[in-house]
């Protein structure tokens, strides 16, 4: 059964209220403390959260299905139990979506641009990640990261973000793995065909970094996660560049590609 990642996180919470709701990467290892300076945590008052990517001192990119009330955004976090001197908390001043109704599908427009209530400064643990200048190539090695469950379907929640490498496939691989996908899509298909490594649960909204370049946003995949032959889908950032850049430049009525 294919589920949007944040829905899977809600199910995990219902099954395990005693556990902390967080998100990690299955099959990964603890990220190097300096490799995720752009990675943000997004919480609401219930504690549920997604990931996101700082792309500018005032802007974060995440998934549309991560939209929530009372959003709190944390930057500069590594270990949940250890607060860095430069760790920051921000709120969403404005949120932008491709459609005014905030509709999206598993294969289209699952993207949200967040303007922070005030800018952040670069520091030892905080720095933005540049937007891509070119689309990624099939066969690229891509990096995934997050604070979520490292096991599925039962949840295990570490205190530090985990990172892992996966491969970028032709979109047809995901069409073969997941029923109902259209012939074309503004998404990227990535994973490990033998299984065992994957984003999962609430990893939604976090980055897919291919050959060192920010290329995708964690959107959705199979449940349980990390199953053989079931790569996940990621919103293709490159296709939304004009929309992102227009909004940041002040054209808040900019429209997404059809």
From Swiss-Prot:
pH dependence of activity: Optimum pH is 3-9.
UniProt KW keywords: Disulfide bond, Fibrinogenolytic toxin, Glycoprotein, Hemostasis impairing toxin, Hydrolase, Protease, Secreted, Serine protease, Signal, Toxin, Zymogen
Domain of life: Eukaryota
Subcellular location: Secreted
Active-site residues, record numbering mapped to chain: 65 (charge relay system), 110 (charge relay system), 204 (charge relay system)
Gene3D superfamilies found in the cross-reference section: Trypsin-like serine proteases
EC number in record: 3.4.21.-
UniProt PTM comment: N- and O-glycosylated. The glycosylation has a stabilizing effect on the protein. However, the removal of part of the carbohydrates enhances the proteolytic activity of the SVSP towards human and rat fibrinogen.
Signal sequence segment: 1-18
Temperature-dependence annotation: Thermostable.
InterPro entries, sorted: Peptidase_S1_PA, Peptidase_S1_PA_chymotrypsin, Peptidase_S1A, Trypsin_dom, TRYPSIN_HIS, TRYPSIN_SER
Protease is among the record's keywords: yes
GO BP annotations, alphabetical order: proteolysis
Keyword Hydrolase: yes
Annotated disulfide bonds: 31-163, 50-66, 98-256, 142-210, 174-189, 200-225
Prosegment location in residue numbers: 19-24
Stretches assigned to the Peptidase S1 domain: 25-249
Main location: secreted
Inhibition and activation profile: Inhibited by diisopropylfluorophosphate (DFP), but not by SBTI, Antithrombin III/heparin and BPTI, probably due to steric hindrance caused by its huge carbohydrate moietie.
Misc remark: Negative results: does not have coagulant activities and does not cause unspecific degradation of plasma proteins. Does not degrade gamma chain of fibrinogen (FGG) and is not active towards fibrin clots.
Function: Snake venom serine protease that has a potent and selective fibrinogenolytic activity. Preferentially cleaves the alpha-chain (FGA) of human and rat fibrinogen at Arg-|-Gly bonds, and slowly digests the beta-chain (FGB). In vivo, completely avoids thrombus formation induced in rat, decreases the fibrinogen plasma level and prolonges the recalcification time. Possesses esterolytic and amidolytic activities.
Subunit structure: Monomer.
The protein's name: Snake venom serine protease BPA
Native source organism of the sequence: Bothrops jararaca (Jararaca)
């Amino acid at each position: 059964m294919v589920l949007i990642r944040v829905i899977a996180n809600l199910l995990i919470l219902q099954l395990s209220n005693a556990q902390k709701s967080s998100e990690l990467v299955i099959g990964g290892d603890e990220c190097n403390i300096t490799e995720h300076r752009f990675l943000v945590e997004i919480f609401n008052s219930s504690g549920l959260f997604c990931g996101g990517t700082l792309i500018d001192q005032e802007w974060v990119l995440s998934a549309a299905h991560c939209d929530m009330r009372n959003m709190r955004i944390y930057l500069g976090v590594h270990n949940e139990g250890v607060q860095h001197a430069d760790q920051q908390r921000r709120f969403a001043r404005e949120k932008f979506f491709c459609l005014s109704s905030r509709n999206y599908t598993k294969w289209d427009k699952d993207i949200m641009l967040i303007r922070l209530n005030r800018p952040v400064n670069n520091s030892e643990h905080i720095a933005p990640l540049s937007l891509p200048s070119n689309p990624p190539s099939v066969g690229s090695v891509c990096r995934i990261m997050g604070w979520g469950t490292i096991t599925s379907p039962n949840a295990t929640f570490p205190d530090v973000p985990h990172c892992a490498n996966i491969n970028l496939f032709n979109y047809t691989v995901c069409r073969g793995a997941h029923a109902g996908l259209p012939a074309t899509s503004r998404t990227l298909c990535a994973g490990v065909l033998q299984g065992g490594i994957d984003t999962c649960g609430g990893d939604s909204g976090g980055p897919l970094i291919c050959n060192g370049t920010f290329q995708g946003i964690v959107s959705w995949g199979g449940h349980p996660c990390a199953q053989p032959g079931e790569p996940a889908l990621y919103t293709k950032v490159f296709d939304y560049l004009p929309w992102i850049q227009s909004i940041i430049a002040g054209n808040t009525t900019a429209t997404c590609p059809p």
